[in-house]
UniProtKB/Swiss-Prot annotation:
SUPFAM superfamilies assigned to the protein according to its UniProt record, in alphabetical order: Restriction endonuclease-like
Family: Belongs to the UPF0102 family.
HAMAP family (alphabetical): UPF0102
Coiled coil: none
Protein name (Swiss-Prot/TrEMBL): UPF0102 protein TM1040_0449
GO molecular function: nucleic acid binding
InterPro entries per record: Restrct_endonuc-II-like (IPR011335), tRNA_endonuc-like_dom_sf (IPR011856), UPF0102_YraN-like (IPR003509)
Pfam families the record matches: UPF0102
Top-level taxon: Bacteria
Length: 124
């Protein structure tokens, strides 16, 4: 790996972490509770897991310079991976797969603008 590629990867990591922090603050402002950040399950990573009362929220955070570019980063295969990982997480909940849950997408762009798209894929 070249030094430039390593630097780009590191910058992407920091940008992703910053976007996740912005998303966390947006959810906390709505009264939700953060359960896990960057939870890794058997099918991959979930950016954020939160609770809103009895409901578990799985959030995928996408960031870019504009809202449209952030939205364009959402890929069906990736969302299926998040959905599968969410199922694995729910297995540890008292109600298992019967736990109320939803899958959100959080778009972060510009100077920290944020949009939470609740139940983005209609699962849950």
């Amino acid at each position: 790996m070249t030094q430039d590629a390593r630097a780009r990867g590191q910058n992407a990591h920091f940008a992703g972490a910053a976007a996740e922090e912005i998303a966390i603050r947006a959810y906390l402002a709505r009264g939700l509770t953060l359960v896990k950040s960057r939870w890794r399950g058997p099918h991959g990573e979930i950016d954020l897991i939160l609770r809103d009362g009895e409901t578990v929220i799985f959030a995928e955070v996408k960031s870019s310079t504009t809202r449209d570019k952030a939205a364009a980063r959402i890929k069906p295969a990736q969302m299926q991976r998040v959905f599968n990982s969410a199922g694995a997480f729910l297995e540890g909940e008292p109600l298992g797969q019967l736990t109320p849950a939803r899958l959100d997408v959080v778009l972060v762009w510009g100077a920290g603008e944020v949009e939470i798209i609740e139940n983005a894929y209609g699962h849950g």
